[in-house]
Every structure is written in C-alpha cells, then in structure tokens.
Amino acid sequence: PGTKEEIIAYFKDFTKIVHKYGMIVSGDCNSELFHRLEATETDLSVFKDIGVDILRMDFSFNDERDATLINNKEGIKIEMSTSFIDVIETAIKNGAKPENISTCHNFYPERYTAPSLEAINDINNYWKAKNIPVAIFISSLVKGSHGPWPVSDGLPTIEEHRDMPIEIQ
C-alpha cells in the first residue's frame, strides 16, 4: 500500500543499491500494480524510473498490446511465465522481438505441488529452441525466510529441490 510516489521512492532506493553492486533488477508486476502506477503498454517510464531492468508480467493483454509492451521504448526486458506459450507465440507473430522476452517458471510454496525436474526440462527445451531465456526459483533452507506471504516449505520451482542446499540446486 501507499501512494504512487511512495511506491516509486521505496523501490527506487532498493534498485539503486542493487545496481551499485552490478546486479540486475527483475520486478514482478500484476495488473493492479501496473494500473496503480499508471503504466501502459506504450509507456513503462515509471518502471524505468524505479530502476527495473526486467519486468515480470503476472498477466497479459492477450492481444497486440503484448507485442507493443515487449518492444517498449524504455528497453525493459519483459518476462512472462513459461506457461504463457500461446501469449508469447502470438506476441511474436504480432511483431514482438524475441530478444526482448525472457520467461520464468512459477514458485510452489506448498510441499508436493511443484513440477518434477523432467517436466521443467521439457519446457526449458521448448524455450531454449526459440532462444528465449528461462529462469527458475530456488529454495532457501534458511529458517524464517519468507516469500510474498508466510511460507515454511520454501519457494522452489522443482519439487526435488525443495529440501536441497542452495549450492546443489
């Protein structure tokens, strides 16, 4: 919660520190935040101002606006769920440049709900064949670590990784 200006200031302070250490900022965005920050598919300047390098979209427009968003003038890479196959394929047919797209698997906070390594590899191979990068979530064994809500079973993409040390995942 907070005003548009408070949200921008909060995240801008964070992204400055991240960039100072040479890291890339990937910001997760749902439709509510997108509209609250008054962003549009033709104007992502608010995210550029915040310092976002990759914008992970938790929603799509399901029309030609996805291609416009992906080809944004701000140069922000657009990340979509690996499950958005039809959305991404349609966006590319509508002129989206594949080099402006990345994908990311979801995380699974509840034990026994995450996909297997084999299932993840199948979808990774699909995107790899299209030269579109894929990201996953790794799980933390640190007690008291958290996610977007209280969780106690980690936030892995792959079920087999849930209880593995980070250096093995």
Describe the role of every protein-language-model region.
Residues 1-14:
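Glycine-rich, proline-tolerant flexible connector loops at the mouths of alpha/beta enzymes
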Residues 1, 45-55:
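Catalytic domains of carbohydrate-active enzymes, especially glycoside hydrolases
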Residues 12-22, 48, 67-73, 124-128:
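Surface-exposed amphipathic alpha-helices with a cationic face
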Residues 36-45, 66-68, 87-96:
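Distinct, well-ordered alpha-helical segments
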Residues 29, 51-63, 76-86, 102-109:
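Catalytic beta/alpha-barrel core
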Residues 19-25, 51-53, 72-76, 97-101, ...:
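Short, well-ordered coil/turn segments that N-cap beta-strands
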Residues 2-4, 31-37, 84-86, 109-112:
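Short, small-residue-enriched loops and turns at beta-alpha junctions
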Residues 83-168:
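Catalytic alpha/beta core domains of metabolic enzymes, predominantly
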